[in-house]
Amino acid sequence: MTNYPYKTREGGATVTVFVPYDCGNHCPFCINKQEYENPVGFSLEKICESIRTMDEITPKCDFVFTGGEPFADLDALQTMLDQIPTTHRVFINTTLPTLQGATEDDLVAFTEKNKDKITCINCSRHVVKYVAECSDDIFSRIAVPVRVNCVLYKDYPKENLKPYLDRFKPYGVSVQFRFDYTDTTPENLYEEESDKILHDLKDLFHYTGMDGCRM
């Protein structure tokens, strides 16, 4: 992995924005769920105020919207995006779920409206499904770049990894596999010898470097 050194963002810190509404999902590896159990003081107005403050401090930082599910409230997400000048890069972490009160056409229209502001959408699509997802066809319609993120959780089926990648070939999106953050420790973070995921990926695929949505 030394041939592909990790690179940090030039221009300031990365600001992570936890949207002030829950996703309604229960993914077993989610590290944010407990943040939504006590939403006291967690409001759209305060988040917008914080966004403006960070813009004053570091006018070229990256903003990453996560949650929760940012697309669960398109009006609120639009309000937050409207606070961010175009000097910043903006990333959105999402499952692109099926939503009450919003259609796939609504999601596509939202990306079209904000295509000059949204740098990339990081969409979770897992080998084992945990949420009700909208169709993969939306990847060919979204007006901004998309990267698919896949958490390889516990005893994932290795034999499904290649069919999983083949699933996204028609859409030309990048796919990132990652470890379960809830199981990550300082001791195992850089450990390669007993890393099952790393060995499975090396066995099935050829790593050529990082591309796609990089924060």
PLM features: residue spans?
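Short, well-ordered amphipathic alpha-helices
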Residues: E49-I51, D106-L107
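Canonical Radical SAM [4Fe-4S] cluster-binding loop centered on the CxxxCxxC motif
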Residues: T2-E49
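Core AdoMet radical
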Residues: N32-F42, T58-D73, T86-A102, K115-C134, ...
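Distinct, well-ordered alpha-helical segments
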Residues: D75-D82, Q100-K113, A132-D137, K158-L165
